[in-house]
A protein has these predicted regions:
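Acidic, proline/glycine-enriched N-terminal capping motif
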Residues: 1-62, 67-69, 195
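Residues forming anionic-ligand binding surfaces in small-molecule and nucleic-acid pockets
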Residues: 12-19, 23-24, 68-80, 109-112, ...
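Short hydrophobic/aromatic beta-strand micro-patches
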Residues: 30, 85-87, 171-173
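Hydrophobic (often cysteine-bearing) scaffold residues that line and stabilize catalytic clefts
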Residues: 32, 36, 94, 122
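Short, surface-exposed acidic/glycine-rich loop or hinge patches that mediate macromolecular interfaces
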Residues: 34, 88-89, 124, 175
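Well-ordered mid-protein domain cores that form the structural environment of catalytic cofactors
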Residues: 46-104
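Glycine-rich, acidic
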Residues: 102, 106-196
Length: 196
C-alpha cells in the first residue's frame, strides 16, 4: 500500500527508528554467462568493469538509439553474474529490451520480478532490526551487497539506496516474503507505504 497508518508517523519511523517497505513490485533480473559484463557495457550507461565484485552501481538502461529507458541498480557478483533492479513501472519493458539486446548465445537472462520478494529497511535502527532476524557477522556497507542462505533459500542483501541512501534491501524467494516481513516487524520495524 501507499500508506499504512499516518504519513507523518511513517516518515518519523524512518528518521528515528526503522521503517519497513514492501518494494516487491520493482523489476528484478539476473544475467549470467560468459560475456555478461561485455554485453551490459553495451546496454548500460556506465563502465561495468569499474564496478568490483560484491558492489552495486547506479546506471541507466539505454535504448539502441542511446535514449534513457530506465534507472537500473546493478549488483555485480562476478564478471559473469549480475543482478539488475529496475523501476516497477518499467519492469516489463526493461526485460523485453534486455531480452532483445542479448546477443551472446551463452548468456542466460531470467526475469525474477515475480519470483522474488523485496523488502527495504530505512532508519537509524535498520541495522539493529535486521541483525535481530538475520545474524550476519557484517551487514553490507553503502554500495555493497552480499548473498546468504536461510532455511535452504538463497537471499540477497543490498545497501544500494533503492528507497534512500541509507536503506537496506532484502531480496528473498516470494514464498518466504511474508515471514521475513512479520519477523522484521516483530524485531521493531514499523510498516510504511511505498510509492516506488
Amino acid at each position: 500500500p501507499q500508506q499504512y497508518t499516518d504519513l507523518i508517523e511513517e516518515h518519523m519511523a524512518t528518521r528515528s527508528a526503522c521503517g519497513i517497505f514492501d518494494i516487491s513490485h520493482v523489476g528484478k533480473f539476473r544475467l549470467t554467462g560468459n560475456g555478461a559484463l561485455e554485453q551490459l557495457e553495451q546496454l548500460l550507461s556506465n563502465r561495468i568493469s569499474d564496478c568490483c565484485d560484491g558492489h552495486t552501481q547506479q546506471t541507466l538502461l539505454l535504448t539502441d538509439k542511446g535514449m534513457i529507458m530506465d534507472r537500473i541498480t546493478l549488483c555485480r557478483e562476478s564478471a559473469g553474474r549480475f543482478f539488475l533492479i529496475g523501476s516497477a513501472s518499467q519492469a516489463d519493458a526493461d526485460f523485453d529490451s534486455l531480452q532483445r539486446s542479448i546477443r551472446h548465445g551463452s548468456l542466460k537472462l531470467e526475469n525474477e520480478t515475480d519470483r522474488l520478494c523485496a523488502i527495504a529497511l530505512l532508519g537509524p535502527d535498520a541495522d539493529k532490526v535486521l541483525s535481530k532476524v538475520h545474524f550476519a557477522a557484517e551487514l553490507p556497507q553503502r554500495g555493497e551487497f552480499c548473498s546468504f542462505r536461510r532455511g535452504g533459500q538463497q537471499c540477497l542483501l543490498t545497501r544500494a539506496g533503492l528507497v534512500s541512501d541509507e536503506s537496506l534491501e532484502l531480496f528473498c524467494p516470494a514464498a518466504t516474503g511474508i515471514a521475513w516481513f512479520e519477523q522484521l516487524m516483530t524485531a521493531g520495524a514499523i510498516p510504511c507505504g511505498s510509492r516506488l
